[in-house]
Structure formats: C-alpha cells, structure tokens
Amino acid sequence: TDIGILAEKIRWLGTVRYTISSLFYIFNIKKRYGTLFINNKKFKENYLFVLIANTKYTGKGMLIAPDANLNDGLLDLIIVKNNINKFALIKLLPKLFTGEHISSQYVEYKQVKSIEIIPEKNECLNIDGEIYGTTPVKVNISNKKLPIYFY
C-alpha cells in the first residue's frame, strides 16, 4: 500500500513511478507486527507486507503468485518477513517477475481458504491498485461463485 500511495502522488512520472516508489520504500522500510488468522488458525507475525492474490499476475507483469488458479477455491497468500535487510529486498524485487521470490527464505507462500489480518496499527488497504478501506480485514474465498449484476 505504501508503494501504491506514493506512486499515485507522482503519477505524472508515468510507469517509472512504481520503481521510484519501490526504491523509496526499501530505504524507508516500515516493519509491521500483527495477528494473522490463516484458515482460522492464529499466528503472531512480523512482516513487511502481506499480499493476497487469486491470479498469477499483478501490476505490470509480476508473477506474484505462480501457483494461483482462479478455479481452485484457494487464495494465494504471500508474506514478506520483516527480517529481510535492504540489500536482500533489492535482490528480491526482480524475482517478482519470474515467480522465483516464493523460494526466498524471506517469503512465505501459502494457498489458503481464508485470511484475517489484524495489525498492531491499522493500515490502508490496496485492493487491485486502488486504496480502499483500512485493516483489520478478513478475506474468504467462495468456490465457483461469481455474482452477476444486470443494469
């Protein structure tokens, strides 16, 4: 979310704004702590950020969740741990485009039915590139259900 908020403020720079925002974020890392309920099991976590996906790709071609499948009834959960140093984080960024980031010791990748995030301090939510609402947040997946609205 931090990257997205800054990127919106410098939108006039075009697509390079995400690279600039990412670098700014790396040098101003905000470590987070909170409680996660993963499939209704409670975990205390230290993390930089938590990302929930239902498709393989996000942004401009980032293979963020290589095992994601729209039809499997699962959410893909990516947790970047806050014990990562700045150098390791810089090395990790290019791997987001190949999916190799999920094998990093600093990344936890799981497929789950539900996730609830209750951070120590509430944060803005970035939902599909839009800042919308704040934490805490609970996300569930409903298998093979898609609401259709007619106007």
For each of these PLM feature ranges, what is it?
Residues 1-151:
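Long C-terminal subdomains/extensions of small-metabolite kinases
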